[in-house]
Amino acid sequence: MARVCSVCGKGTTFGHNVSHSNRRTNRRWVANLKRVHGRFPDGKVRTAYVCVKCLKAGKVEIL
């Protein structure tokens, strides 16, 4: 699984955890994806991974 939203393309982003002493360690933020069976903006019905932001916005009709 590529951890990318099938609708908007949102994926993993990288950054740092910053402690009080300003030490920086690598970390990543992963998109909140759900496996959804539904009708997508292109009109096709399929199962795919969609971020919760797209689900809340109604970009996918859940079947």
Curated annotation (Swiss-Prot):
SUPFAM superfamilies: L28p-like. GO terms for biological process: translation. Keywords: Ribonucleoprotein, Ribosomal protein. GO terms for cellular component: ribonucleoprotein complex; ribosome. The keyword Ribosomal protein applies. Transmembrane segments: none annotated. GO terms for molecular function: structural constituent of ribosome. Belongs to the bacterial ribosomal protein bL28 family. This is Large ribosomal subunit protein bL28. The lineage of its organism: Bacteria, Pseudomonadati, Coprothermobacterota, Coprothermobacteria, Coprothermobacterales.
